[in-house]
Amino acid sequence: MQRLIWNPYLPEGTFIPDGEPHVFGNRLYVYGSHDKGRGMRYCPGDYQVWSAPVDDLTNWTCEKTAYHRRGKGNRLGIRCMWAPDCTQGADGRYYLYFCFDFQNKVNVLVSNTPDGPFRYYGEVRHPNGTLYGQGKDDIMCFDPAIFRDDDGSVYLYSGYSANESLRKMLNQRGIRNVDGTGGQVVRLQADMRTVAEKPRMLIPGYKNSAGTGFEGHEMYEASS
């Protein structure tokens, strides 16, 4: 008889919020942030990828660090890494997308295996080199999600929509790129990091919800 499955499903003292489950091969992998008990910041830990056989979801293991926080773009470890997501590219490699805390860009990691170790691959950019999140029609990037369709097309979802009082508070803390325009989707080129077409708005935010039917329940955060 197999053991019962229960929550929390990971070992005591392991905190992986924002979990994104994906099946690769015969294992279920969970990609998420890495929080610390009694911490003073959200998710200051290195990325870990926990996995289990699809036919035995009681047997969760994590054999290595998937990506260290003190990597490119964060050598001093000042920033935290928030909710990631992962997909397999047409080349068979695995691409992980994430944002540092309130840094308006999407970082891309790549690995030959689903659980890493991942290496830094670059940022999502428009064809002209502009970072996605800083273009004219872009939204603020936050907690991205990634989806590869059956036809091979790859779509990136992101967005953050703080209300006016929260935007003012964040601006006072020196965070100037906070927007309130909701969530977007962009299709990526085959290189998995270049925007292929103009971003499309999916769900309005506090700033632009009037007359849409989303008033009072606008997009806030976490496309992932």
Protein language model regions, located:
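Carbohydrate-active catalytic/glycan-binding domains of CAZyme proteins
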Residues: 1-224
